[in-house]
C-alpha cells in the first residue's frame, strides 16, 4: 500500500454541519426512544418492582483506562479497595527439585540445606488439590507444559512412571508461538543505574539548552548548529519505520482488560494494530518488573502487516526520553512508542502526565522531540483527548507537534478529561482536527525533502470514541476524514466488531460462538499466566474482568432497532436460550460460573470483586 494518504476531495459546502447517524435519526422520528435499547416483546421479562429499573452508569473508557469517576449514589459506584491478589500454592516447590537430570533424579539445589522451599516432590503432589478434568490446554496446543508438576491438569501430561510427557511434533510446530520482550536480564542494570543511557543524557542536555525560537536570528542559528553537532549519527525522523494506519483495525490501549491474552484474541478476530497497557516512564527506567511486563507482546502481534505499540506517559521530559531509549533498545518488534496525553486518572494528572500534557504544549513538544531523538528507528505517536476542560485544545497541540515534524500519528479521543462520559464523543471536533492535519501534512512532507529532521511520510489521524457498529466505523472514516478508528469499549463488549466492519453488516453471534471466544481467552491466559494454581486464578480473574464488559452486549437478534447504540439501556430481557441469558447476566457470580467450563471448579483461594458494586443492564438472571 502506498504511503500517500487517500484524501476524499469533498467540497466544504457539501459537508453536513454535524456528523449524524441518519438511520438512527430516522428511527427516532418513527418512534425509537433515544437512550433505550428496545427489546422485542417476546424477550421482555416483567419486573418485580419499579426500583429494579435503577442502574448505575454504564461501563466507560475511563474504567478501561484505569480512570475514576465522580462519586455516584451510595448504592452504586466502584469497589476501589477490591482485593484481586491471588494466593499461590500452600507448599512452594524449589525450582531445582522440579528439574530432572537424564537419569531421572532431580537437580541439586544450589542453596542446599538453607533453601526455604520444598524438595520432596511426593509431599508437594499430595498437597495439591485434585487435578482438573480434561487435557491441559497449554500442552494440547504446544505439546509441552512449562508448569510441569505444578500444572492443575498434571495427569494429562504425566506417564504411568510419573515422568512428564512432551509431544515433540506439536512443540516443533509451535516454535514461533511465543511471547516477546522478556527483559529480565536487563532489569538489574536499570535498577542499579548501570544501564547505558548516555544517548538520553546527551539528548536531555540538548533539550534543556534549547533557545526559545523567538530570540534573535544569531542565537537561532547557534541552536541549529549545536543540534546538528550533538545529533550526528542518530537516526533521523525521515529514516524511521514508516507506519501505515490507513484503514487499519486498531484496538485501543486498555488498562487491566487490554492484557496480552485479550490482544491475542483480538488478533484472531481481525485486529491489525494493538497496544500494550499504559506504562509509567519512571518505573520503567528504574527497572520495575511489573512495569516492564506491560511491554510484552505475542509473536502474532508483530507479524508482517501487523503493528504493536508500547504506550507510555511521563510528567517530565527526561523520564520520557530515557524510557523511550530503553524501550526501543530492549523491546523487539515494536512499531511505535505512543505517548499518552489523554489519561484522565487523577494520580497521573496531578503529577503532570497523561491529559495534563494537553495544557503544557511546550513541554509536550519537548517530550516528543526528545523521545524521537533516542528511539532509533521506532516512530513516536501521540494519543490525546479534546482537552482537559470545556475549551478544546487538541487542534492547537497537533499544530504545534506537526510543526516540530517528529510525530508519526495522532489519535484523538473525542472527549475532554472533565467531560468523561456525560456526553457522546465529539466527532465534529475530531473532523476539524483531522482536516487541519491533512491540510498541513503536505507542507510537512515538502519540508522533509529539505530537512531530514522531519518525518517523510504522512502523519496519520485516528479517531476514537463510541465506535460500536460497522456503520459507526465507516461513518467516522468517510465523514470525519480520519485515516482509521481506534476501538475501545466496542471491542470489549463485542470482540467481533472488526468482522462486522469488514463485512459491513450486523452479525448476530450465538451464545455458543461467544463461549468459544471465552474458551480461547482462557487458553491464551493459561499460556501467559501459567497452568498452575496461581495461573488458573489469574486467568479466571481476567476472564471475569473481560465478562464485566461482554455481559453488556444485547444480542442484535432480540433488538427491535439496528444499529445498536453503545450507551442505550435495555429493559429486563431474556435470551433465546439459557446460555445466552446467562452470558447477559450482570451478577459476577454468574461470570465465575461460566469460567468453570474452561478452568474447572472455583477453589476457596480464588478472590474476585467486580469493579462496580452493582452492574448495569440487568437480565432475567441478574
From Swiss-Prot:
**PANTHER family associated with the record:** TRNA-DIHYDROURIDINE(47) SYNTHASE [NAD(P)(+)]-LIKE
Q: Catalytic center at which residues?
A: 343
- Report biased composition (Low complexity) as residue ranges: 47-59
Binding positions for FMN per the UniProt entry: 253-255, 311, 383, 413, 464-466, 488-489
Domain of life according to the entry: Eukaryota
Natural source organism: Yarrowia lipolytica (strain CLIB 122 / E 150)
For this protein, the record's PROSITE patterns field holds: UPF0034, ZF_C3H1
UniProt similarity note: Belongs to the Dus family. Dus3 subfamily.
Q: What is this protein called?
A: tRNA-dihydrouridine(47) synthase [NAD(P)(+)]
Q: Which GO terms describe its molecular function?
A: flavin adenine dinucleotide binding; mRNA dihydrouridine synthase activity; tRNA dihydrouridine synthase activity; tRNA-dihydrouridine47 synthase activity; zinc ion binding
Q: Name one GO biological process term.
A: mRNA processing
Bias class Basic and acidic residues marks the residues at 66-75
- From the UniProt entry, list the residue stretches annotated as the region Disordered: 47-88
SUPFAM superfamilies xrefs: FMN-linked oxidoreductases
Amino acid at each position: 500500500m502506498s504511503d500517500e494518504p487517500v484524501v476524499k476531495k469533498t467540497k466544504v459546502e457539501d459537508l453536513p454541519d454535524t456528523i449524524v447517524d441518519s438511520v438512527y435519526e430516522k428511527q427516532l422520528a418513527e418512534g425509537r426512544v433515544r437512550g433505550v435499547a428496545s427489546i422485542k416483546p417476546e424477550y421482555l421479562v416483567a419486573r418485580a418492582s419499579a426500583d429494579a429499573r435503577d442502574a448505575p452508569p454504564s461501563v466507560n473508557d475511563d474504567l478501561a483506562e484505569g480512570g475514576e469517576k465522580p462519586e455516584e449514589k451510595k448504592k452504586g459506584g466502584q469497589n476501589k479497595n477490591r482485593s484481586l491478589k491471588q494466593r499461590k500454592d500452600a507448599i512452594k516447590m524449589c525450582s531445582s527439585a522440579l528439574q530432572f537430570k537424564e537419569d531421572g533424579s532431580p537437580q541439586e539445589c544450589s542453596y542446599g540445606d538453607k533453601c526455604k522451599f520444598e524438595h520432596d516432590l511426593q509431599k508437594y503432589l499430595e498437597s495439591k488439590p485434585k487435578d482438573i478434568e480434561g487435557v491441559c490446554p497449554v500442552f494440547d496446543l504446544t505439546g509441552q507444559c512449562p508448569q510441569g508438576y505444578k500444572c492443575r491438569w498434571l495427569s494429562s501430561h504425566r506417564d504411568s512412571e510419573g515422568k512428564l510427557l512432551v509431544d515433540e511434533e506439536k512443540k516443533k510446530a509451535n516454535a514461533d508461538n511465543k511471547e516477546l520482550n522478556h527483559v529480565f536480564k536487563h532489569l538489574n542494570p536499570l535498577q542499579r543505574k548501570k544501564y547505558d543511557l548516555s544517548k538520553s543524557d546527551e539528548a536531555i542536555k540538548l533539550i534543556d539548552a534549547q533557545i526559545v525560537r523567538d530570540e534573535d536570528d544569531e542565537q537561532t542559528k547557534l541552536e541549529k548548529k549545536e543540534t546538528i553537532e550533538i545529533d550526528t549519527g542518530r537516526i533521523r525522523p525521515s529514516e524511521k519505520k514508516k507506519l501505515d494506519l490507513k484503514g487499519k483495525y486498531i484496538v485501543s490501549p486498555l488498562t487491566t482488560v487490554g492484557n496480552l491474552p485479550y490482544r491475542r484474541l483480538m488478533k484472531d478476530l481481525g485486529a491489525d494494530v494493538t497496544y500494550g497497557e499504559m506504562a509509567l516512564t519512571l518505573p520503567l527506567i528504574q527497572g520495575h518488573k511489573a512495569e516492564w511486563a506491560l511491554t510484552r507482546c505475542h509473536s502474532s502481534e508483530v507479524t508482517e502487516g501487523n503493528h504493536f505499540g508500547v504506550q507510555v506517559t511521563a510528567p517530565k521530559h527526561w523520564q520520557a526520553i530515557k524510557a523511550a531509549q530503553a524501550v526501543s533498545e530492549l523491546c523487539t518488534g515494536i512499531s511505535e512508542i505512543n505517548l499518552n496525553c489523554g489519561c484522565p486518572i487523577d494520580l497521573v494528572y496531578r503529577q503532570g502526565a497523561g491529559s495534563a500534557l494537553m495544557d503544557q504544549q511546550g513541554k509536550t513538544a519537548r517530550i516528543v522531540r526528545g523521545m524521537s531523538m533516542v528511539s532509533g528507528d521506532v516512530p513516536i505517536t501521540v494519543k490525546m483527548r479534546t482537552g482537559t476542560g470545556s475549551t478544546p485544545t487538541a487542534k492547537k497541540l497537533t499544530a504545534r507537534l506537526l510543526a516540530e515534524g517528529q510525530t508519526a500519528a495522532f489519535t484523538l479521543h473525542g472527549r475532554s478529561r472533565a467531560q468523561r462520559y456525560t456526553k457522546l464523543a465529539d466527532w465534529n471536533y475530531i473532523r476539524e482536527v483531522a482536516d487541519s492535519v491533512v491540510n498541513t501534512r503536505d507542507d510537512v512532507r515538502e519540508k522533509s525533502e529539505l530537512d531530514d529532521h522531519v518525518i517523510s511520510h504522512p502523519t496519520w489521524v485516528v479517531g476514537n470514541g463510541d465506535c460500536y457498529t460497522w456503520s459507526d466505523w465507516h461513518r467516522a472514516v468517510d465523514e470525519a476524514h480520519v485515516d482509521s478508528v481506534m476501538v475501545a469499549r466496542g471491542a470489549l463488549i463485542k470482540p467481533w466488531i472488526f468482522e462486522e466492519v469488514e463485512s459491513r453488516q450486523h452479525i448476530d453471534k450465538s451464545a455458543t460462538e461467544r463461549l468459544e471466544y471465552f474458551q480461547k481467552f482462557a487458553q491464551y491466559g493459561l499460556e501467559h499466566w501459567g497452568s498452575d494454581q496461581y495461573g488458573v486464578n489469574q486467568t479466571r480473574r481476567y476472564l471475569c474482568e473481560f465478562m464485566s464488559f461482554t455481559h453488556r452486549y444485547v444480542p442484535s437478534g432480540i433488538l427491535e432497532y439496528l444499529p445498536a447504540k453503545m450507551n442505550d439501556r435495555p429493559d429486563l430481557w431474556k435470551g433465546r436460550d439459557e446460555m445466552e441469558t446467562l452470558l447477559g447476566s450482570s451478577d459476577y457470580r454468574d461470570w465465575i460460573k461460566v469460567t468453570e467450563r474452561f478452568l474447572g471448579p472455583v477453589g476457596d483461594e480464588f478472590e474476585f470483586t467486580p469493579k462496580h458494586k452493582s452492574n448495569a443492564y440487568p437480565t432475567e438472571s441478574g
